[in-house]
A protein has these predicted regions:
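Extended catalytic-interface subdomain
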Residues: 284-287, 291-397
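Structured loops at beta-to-helix junctions and adjacent beta-edge loops in soluble globular domains
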Residues: 52-55, 340, 426-427
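N-terminal non-catalytic accessory region
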Residues: 1-260, 264-322, 345-353, 450-452, ...
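C-terminal subdomain of alpha/beta-hydrolase-fold enzymes, centered on the catalytic histidine
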Residues: 384-571
Length: 571
């Protein structure tokens, strides 16, 4: 009879209010139902989880609070964003997407239904969910909330198992079940090995018992990804301090947070961790697909855009080099994604028609040798593209200032990580990436005035000596010839490009996630092994949807948070 009575019990879920008090909702039922509705008090210790998105993953508005970059979900894509930006040229992009003319937009879409710990739209907004991409992140954040806050009895966390434990079948058995200490647990979907066949440290029941003593409200932190990540780091510090403060009310106690980052958000979090007293307020950090030392594809996009890399993304980010440069050059945050000195030398190559490299850069300093190379055609920025039609031109000096900020930022975080850091990154050849950018050359259709210059002269050419429209079509010498021909009764125009040499940027050449090469993703353990608790290489993972679409990435994040929860100060 005891179990039958327990099985009939009814429970109402408590949701925290903005003042960290709790409230429950219950609909009136038939008077024949006399069983009491029970409310279980959640733990009074709080360790908030703060999600920090990647570049372009935060919603932005202009200074009148009109959205200019809004990642709301329409049939699993940011359809309105794609439509709006696909119609904007380089000038419009330059006008709208400037760090001093934009700010974080806080009123993006939020979930319509309750989550495990959030009871209404206002609370989602207050916790920052409206600041970040609904398309890329909300599905994951809802999943994480359910995992961390859906059940407080560790004996009922079905992702963790041990053969010595029986499985409760009835509600009564579940309510009475307790997890014993001293067990080594198996975790669902967790890989057996991290990287280089290194073993994964198991979760113990003691860690689960420690985790069960706290709540883990899920917050999101949007930032202006056009501005320097140094500024974003300072804003993150302010948000963390605010979150800790608001979770210290009455008998509720909070002293630390856990950070989970995506892509460039990892650079923001690392910089924040270096600010005074912040490492003590952060239990640890989980980094996903972070360009730890930069990504060479950032250079490639400045030169030829994204059309041949990803047509759909190119409509938004920029189909050609002119559209990308218009925003990139005036945005310190974007420039901070370029390969740093720690990325290493020799990632930019120019090859002759036989495949032999005739130029390899940088030798040491990518900032002076490539990013501020003003004359050479292979320099990061074509100065003419700083002044697009209908835009608001920036001068070379402003670009130089932004590159200097990137250099200083890179050096400030180089090799520096929180003492409790977990990492996962894309590896293997399934997706591929660009560890190097390679310019291939071949003989063009000879012009009338062909001078017969050898390929070895190509690296010495200036911007003015190269013809390009910002796509992956560059020409040395020659001209564009347009002629009219008849096809049946119709006249059509035929375009022919003559040149001494044609130059094309090669495709993917290394393991990675499509954006970040494995050599950058794995850099944390190589440069700071004592700070890295576990580092996972995942084959087949894609960069933008890493948290949304990869069950293994989700499991690793859940594992890392569980490990970090056991290290939290719950006094």
């Amino acid at each position: 009879m005891g179990d039958e009575t327990l099985d009939r019990q009814r429970f109402a879920r408590l949701y925290p209010t903005k003042n960290n008090r709790f409230q429950a909702e219950w609909h009136l039922t038939d008077t024949k139902l006399l069983d009491a509705v029970k409310i279980a008090l959640p733990p009074l210790r709080v360790v908030p989880i703060v999600f920090v998105p990647g570049i372009m993953g935060s919603n932005l508005s202009d200074l009148r609070n009109e959205p200019v970059w809004l990642l709301n979900n329409v049939k699993n894509i940011p359809a309105n964003l794609v439509y709006n930006w696909s119609r904007r040229d380089a000038g419009a992009r330059q006008l709208l997407l400037h760090p001093k003319r934009t700010q974080v937009y806080t009123l993006g879409a939020v979930p319509k239904e309750k989550s495990a710990s959030i009871g209404n739209a206002q609370e989602f907004t207050r916790r920052g969910w409206g600041e970040v991409s609904e398309v890329s992140y909300h599905k994951f954040l809802l999943w994480l909330d359910k995992k961390m806050n859906g059940e407080h009895n560790p004996a009922l966390w079905d992702d963790f198992s041990n053969d010595s434990l029986g499985r409760a079948k009835t509600i009564g058995e579940k309510l009475a079940s307790k997890l014993p200490a001293g067990l080594v647990m198996r975790m669902a979907n967790l890989p057996d090995f991290s990287e280089r066949n290194l073993p994964v440290e198991a979760v113990t029941s003691d860690e689960l018992l420690k985790r069960s003593k706290a709540r883990f409200p899920i917050y999101a932190f949007g930032y202006n990804w056009l501005a320097s990540n140094k500024i974003a780091a300072q804003s993150l510090r302010e948000r963390i301090e605010k979150i800790i403060s608001e979770n210290n009310v009455g008998t509720v106690r909070c002293s630390q947070v856990i950070l989970v980052t995506h892509s460039m958000g990892g650079l923001v979090a690392r910089a924040c961790n270096l600010l005074p007293e912040m490492s003590k307020k952060i239990v640890g950090i989980v980094h996903g697909v972070m360009p730890a030392t930069g990504a060479a594809v950032a250079y490639r996009r400045c030169k030829i855009g994204m059309r041949d890399e990803d047509f759909g993304a190119g409509l938004v980010i920029g189909s050609d080099g002119k559209e990308v440069t218009a925003v990139f050059a005036q945005s310190p945050g974007a420039l901070q994604l370029l390969p740093s000195e720690a990325y290493g030398p020799g990632w930019l190559e120019i090859a002759d028609p036989t495949g032999k490299c005739i130029a390899v850069l940088p030798k040491a300093d990518p900032y002076e040798e490539i990013y501020l190379q003003r004359e050479a055609w292979w320099g990061l920025i074509n100065e003419e593209w700083l002044n697009p039609m209908q835009g608001k031109a920036i001068k070379w000096d402003e670009l130089a200032k932004n590159v200097k900020l990137a250099k200083e930022f890179h050096r400030s975080i180089s090799g520096k990580y929180h003492a409790n850091t977990y990492v996962f990154y894309g590896g293997g050849e399934d997706i591929g990436s660009y560890s190097k950018v390679r310019w291939n050359t071949k003989k063009g259709l000879p012009p009338m005035n062909n001078r017969g210059e050898p390929a070895t002269t190509i690296p010495r050419k200036k911007h003015s000596e190269i013809r390009t429209d910002g796509s992956n079509n560059l020409y040395v010498g020659g001209e564009r010839i347009v002629r009219t021909a008849m096809r049946g009764d119709s006249a059509v125009q035929i375009t022919t490009e003559t040149s001494e040499w044609e130059i094309r940027c090669a495709g993917k050449n290394s393991a990675g996630d499509g954006t970040v090469p494995a050599q950058s993703g794995r850099a944390p353990r190589q440069t700071s092994p004592m700070s890295i608790k576990q580092q996972f290489e995942l084959s087949g993972i894609q960069h933008e949807p890493a948290y949304r679409d990869s069950p293994i990435a989700q499991a690793i994040t859940y594992y890392a948070i569980t490990k970090l929860a056991a290290l939290a100060d719950l006094t």
